């Protein structure tokens, strides 16, 4: 196949070929469900939704796993603060996650494992690492302590981040903490603390406790996709230490590459500053959807390449909304024909070439605008159908054009149609002052009237 993907591990764009012919197995790190999803989560979910959609368009079967981390220090803290069980909190946040993802047009993954359902597999993997001399347990004052991974016993540590152990050690505190053999060693199993609630603890050969974050993903990926699979993805912030540690765990245990291709989506910035709660520029998906329709948000994310930084601002969202409106306006001119995509068509061929080169959505979106321009000129139902179908490859342009262009108005359609009829009556009686008043009143509410020989239509002002 002609698809090429940038591999973080090799730092190069490589021809993609799945290990099992015709079948792609992909694991993407999902959310830690202690709070509502934010824009960074939206960026990752949309990016890998586009990846799995294009793989399917390319004729491949896709098994897509996106996990849910439902046990974590932040989750425990939030549940205690709320006076609720961990399961109550995480169940509620998973429902909210699904609502946000559905709103953004994100297809559900094949599997969405929750970490707490795979604790036996995590303990088994820790046992394998212990037998291979890659894991050791510390001793605490009260007895059994944490189980840690011995980083220096794994030869390939640092290959994903491109850092040597000495470089990594230079960034750490010199003293050995919590009984670790080395400051770089990371926890596989956290021993329970007396202050923690009972639902944050599991029995194990190492004493009561809970799994570390990194072992969760290694165990779930192996259980659902096998010891080696095709694509491992996540945000750029996960490259180190999370994904580096996954490699150490899985490859240390099984002696084979965890994933053939490592993909990382870029960071999100807000008005060219890092998004953070302390700066007051931290937005949940729901806060953004209160201001902008979901397809505009999806389009805003997609028109930037997944590896590039994404800069959020109201001006950029406004521009995305107006740009998407231009595409829908073309589809509103002529009813799109329902036809299969002809990949020999010059527009379709350009679109495919863009997507086959590391999921090049900026160029693919540019093709959509060129195609929309041709639809505007030719009024071709076939080209309109192609525009809608190519947009569908990205999860865009599937709403009824008229409905999309009218969405978001303060007045409902019936009220606006009554005013349009009153304006038409005023014009018939040559009461042009009244006709102008109605037009201007609607314009003041963000409704633009468009007169044509076929009658008057309306849309929301850009």
Curated annotation (Swiss-Prot):
Residues annotated as binding ATP: 277
E.C. number(s) listed in UniProt: 6.1.1.16
The keyword tRNA processing belongs to this UniProt entry's keyword annotation: no
InterPro entries: Cys-tRNA-ligase (IPR015803), Cys-tRNA-synt_Ia_DALR (IPR015273), Cys-tRNA/MSH_ligase (IPR024909), CysS_C (IPR056411), Rossmann-like_a/b/a_fold (IPR014729), tRNA-synt_1_cat_dom (IPR032678), tRNAsynth_Ia_anticodon-bd (IPR009080)
SMART domains in UniProt: DALR_2
Primary location class: cytoplasm
Cellular compartments annotated: Cytoplasm
Domain of life according to the entry: Bacteria
Co-factor(s): Zn(2+)
Gene Ontology biological-process annotations: cysteinyl-tRNA aminoacylation
Residues where Zn(2+) binds: 29, 217, 242, 246
A GO MF label: zinc ion binding
Cofactor note: Binds 1 zinc ion per subunit.
Motif ('HIGH' region): 31-41
Subunit structure as annotated in this protein's UniProt entry: Monomer.
Family: Belongs to the class-I aminoacyl-tRNA synthetase family.
Protein name: Cysteine--tRNA ligase
Taxonomic source organism: Polaromonas sp. (strain JS666 / ATCC BAA-500)
Gene: cysS
């Amino acid at each position: 196949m002609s698809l090429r993907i940038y591999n973080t591990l090799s730092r190069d764009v490589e021809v993609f070929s799945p290990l099992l012919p015709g079948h792609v197995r992909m694991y993407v790190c999902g959310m830690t469900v202690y709070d509502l999803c934010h824009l960074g989560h939206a960026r990752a979910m949309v990016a890998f939704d586009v990846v799995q959609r294009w793989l399917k368009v390319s004729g491949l079967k896709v098994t897509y796993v996106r996990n849910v981390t439902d046990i974590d220090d932040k989750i425990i803290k939030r549940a205690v603060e709320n006076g609720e069980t961990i399961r109550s909190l995480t169940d509620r946040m998973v429902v909210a996650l699904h609502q946000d993802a559905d709103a953004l047009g994100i297809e559900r993954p094949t599997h969405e494992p929750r970490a707490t359902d795979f604790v036996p597999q995590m303990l088994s993997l820790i046992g394998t690492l212990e037998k291979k001399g890659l894991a050791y347990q510390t001793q605490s004052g009260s007895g059994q302590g944490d189980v840690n991974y011995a980083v220096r016993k794994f030869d390939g540590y640092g290959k994903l981040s491109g850092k040597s152990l000495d470089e990594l050690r230079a960034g750490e505190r010199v003293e050995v903490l919590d009984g670790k053999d080395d400051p770089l060693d990371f926890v596989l199993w956290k021993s329970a603390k007396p202050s923690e609630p009972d639902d944050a603890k599991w029995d194990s050969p190492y004493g009561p406790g809970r799994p570390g974050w990194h072992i969760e993903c290694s165990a779930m990926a192996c259980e659902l996709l096998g010891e080696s699979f095709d694509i491992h993805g996540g945000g750029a912030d996960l490259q180190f230490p999370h994904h580096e540690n996954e490699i150490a765990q899985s490859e240390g245990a099984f002696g084979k590459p965890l994933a053939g291709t490592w993909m990382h989506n870029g960071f999100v910035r807000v008005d060219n500053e890092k998004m953070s709660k302390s700066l007051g520029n931290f937005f949940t998906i729901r806060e953004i959807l209160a201001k902008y329709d979901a397809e505009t948000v999806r389009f805003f994310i997609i028109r930037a390449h997944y590896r590039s930084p994404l800069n959020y601002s109201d001006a950029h969202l406004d521009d995305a909304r107006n740009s998407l409106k231009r595409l829908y306006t073309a589809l509103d001119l002529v009813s799109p024909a329902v036809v299969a995509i002809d990949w020999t068509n010059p527009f379709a061929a350009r679109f495919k070439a863009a997507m086959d080169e590391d999921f090049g959505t900026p160029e693919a979106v540019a093709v959509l605008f060129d195609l929309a321009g041709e639809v505007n000129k030719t009024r071709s139902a076939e080209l309109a159908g192609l525009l809608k179908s190519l947009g569908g490859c990205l999860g865009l342009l599937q709403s009824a054009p008229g409905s999309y262009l009218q969405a978001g108005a303060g007045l409902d359609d019936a009220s606006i149609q009554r005013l349009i009829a009153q304006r038409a009556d005023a014009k018939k009686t040559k009461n042009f002052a009244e006709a102008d008043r109605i037009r201007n009143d609607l314009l003041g509410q963000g409704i633009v009237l468009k007169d044509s020989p076929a009658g008057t239509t309306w849309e929301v002002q850009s």
